[in-house]
Amino acid sequence: MKIGIYKDTFANNRGADIAVKNLATGLSERAHAVTLFDKSEFAAKVRGEYDVIVSTGTNEILDLAKVDGLPPIVQQFHTDPNYPFRHWIKRWRRNRAIKAALKKAAAFQVLREAHIEILQKLIGVSKERITVIGNWSSFEGRAKIRTEEKIILCPGAINADKNQSLLVDAFAAVTAEFPDWQVHIYGKGKAKEEAALKKKIDSYALRDKIVLKGYVDLEEPYRRCAFVAFPSKTEGFGMVIVDAAVFSKPTLMIHDWIGCGEVADPRDFALALRRLMSDVDFRRDLGESSRIYCSANYSREKILDEWEALLSEV
């Protein structure tokens, strides 16, 4: 099969960027002719001889909808389908254009069962045109047994949505009980957002306990940590959870992502931190259960099988 995959930019190396690259590589390794192209290559490559085109986001479908004569388009959602429309009043013209463009897609891929009904309400698409397919971890097959250290790992870009400030507040509430523990935050953000997070850390005099590590490959940090804390407000799937599961590490997160993160109480998060920090057997049981579940439901081979089935049907 000849497959075009359009992603406007890979500049940020976010979870969605990684998932798209993984998909392109995986399908290529299964003998499909895959062309992955970005905004700079759009004019030259959009009219290639494809059997199907995968649109990887709402920016992408806006571009593709302007081109006539394209093959069937499969639209991806890397987040809750509501999320791109969160600024309805501020961006009403753009949002209206996105909805019109989405209706030109032949099929849709979402990350969770809960997203099906949301997408149906947004654009009136039938359930039969929506398929749930998750993501697999780039670390699959690379895990090794390591003795855990008293480190809480928090990966993700530093910004309000990733909500690292909630973790800082919660850890500050329990750190006196666990003097040997540290929080390692991996990720980068805008200078203003990084400065605000550092200021909050300094307000608790915890710079020696809460360490900003910047952006690095996370394989070794996952191996070393005791567990992962992921206080993000908005996620479609949360690749961090699947990544952590590869290493049998549990993930502490907010129960639901859209909206709940806005009102999450640091005291509740602190209670959960305390539970995990104080009980190594509990951590390991959760981590192993997560590994078993994710390996059964989000393996590379299973997800590629699901993608091949979807692409062959449109």
Where are the model-predicted features located?
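A conserved mid-protein helix/loop that constitutes part of the nucleotide-sugar donor-binding site
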Residues: 17-22, 150, 154-173
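Membrane-proximal helix-turn-helix segments that form the acceptor-binding/catalytic region
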Residues: 90-108
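Short His-centered aromatic/hydrophobic patch
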Residues: 55-60, 76-78
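Carbohydrate-associated surface elements
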Residues: 114, 136
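Aromatic "clamp/platform" in nucleotide-sugar-dependent glycosyltransferases that forms part
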Residues: 233
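Nucleotide-activated donor-binding/catalytic signature segment of Leloir-type glycosyltransferases, i.e.
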Residues: 196-214
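Glycosyltransferase donor-sugar binding loop
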Residues: 155, 182-196
